[in-house]
């Protein structure tokens, strides 16, 4: 049986997106998706970067090995792209502390699939109602298709990944980025760190350990000027 699904994801590095693991592995089917694609910054009128096949998907083994209920706290995944498309779109940061987030205002941006043929991005923000260390609960408006959307704070740092909705009680939930899953995230980022020159949509960028360089940079005994976005302005 061929089944096609949809979800949301956000860039946390120029070549890495974070999403929900259940967008890739489904317990009800007992298997991973054959293929997964991203359509960065898609809108109803255009696909700016086209349909890009994901190079690799990384997720915690507990999500697959546990039953669907117990696996919920491990429901996040990282999507690795061949090219750093995020350089053209911007990225979200990761949390710098593990404080309780009850009461803070968070934002969710994603693509609901109320109409499977329409790709329209929506954003909403509300306060976190509770934080038990594993899940964040809130009443941000979401629909099917939002799964995998990041929950981010006022500093544009990801604090959770939206995974659950309870329509009856109008409560939605996210897996919190915590001391259990952050080491996994950082290990994946290290393993897929960008290095050297990358050409993106006709512009050149230079990376060191995943970070775009800016300003004047001496590279292989030659000086180059990279603007605030990382784009090279000098010639070869």
Predicted regions and their residues:
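Short beta->alpha transition motifs characteristic of CBS
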Residues: 20-23, 144, 160-168
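Chymotrypsin/trypsin-fold serine protease catalytic domain
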Residues: 72-142, 172-173, 181-186
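Catalytic histidine site
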Residues: 1-37, 127-129, 174
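C-terminal cap/linker of serine protease catalytic domains
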Residues: 163-193
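Extracellular adhesion/carbohydrate-binding repeat motifs centered on closely spaced tryptophans
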Residues: 192-236
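Conserved catalytic-core segment of clan PA serine endopeptidases
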Residues: 4, 25, 29-86
């Amino acid at each position: 049986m061929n089944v096609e699904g949809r979800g949301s994801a956000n860039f946390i590095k120029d070549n890495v997106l974070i999403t929900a693991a259940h967008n890739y592995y489904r317990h009800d089917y007992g298997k991973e998706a054959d293929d997964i694609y991203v359509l960065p910054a898609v809108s109803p009128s255009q696909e700016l970067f086209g349909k890009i096949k994901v190079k690799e998907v990384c997720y915690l083994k507990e999500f697959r090995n546990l039953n669907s209920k117990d696996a919920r706290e491990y429901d996040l995944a990282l999507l690795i792209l061949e090219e750093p498309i995020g350089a053209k779109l911007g990225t979200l940061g990761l949390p710098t502390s593990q404080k309780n987030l009850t009461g803070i205002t968070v934002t969710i941006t994603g693509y609901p699939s109320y109409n499977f043929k329409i790709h329209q991005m929506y954003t909403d923000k509300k306060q976190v109602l509770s934080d038990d260390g594993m899940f964040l609960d809130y009443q941000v408006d979401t629909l099917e298709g939002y799964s995998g959307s990041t929950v981010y704070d006022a500093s544009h740092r990801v604090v959770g990944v939206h995974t659950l909705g309870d329509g009856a009680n109008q409560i939605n939930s996210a897996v919190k980025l915590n001391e259990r899953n952050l080491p996994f995230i950082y290990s994946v980022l290290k393993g897929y760190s960008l290095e050297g020159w990358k050409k993106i949509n006709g512009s050149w960028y230079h990376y060191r350990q995943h970070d775009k360089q800016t300003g004047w940079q001496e590279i292989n005994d030659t000086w180059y000027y990279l603007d605030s976005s990382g784009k090279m302005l000098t010639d070869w």
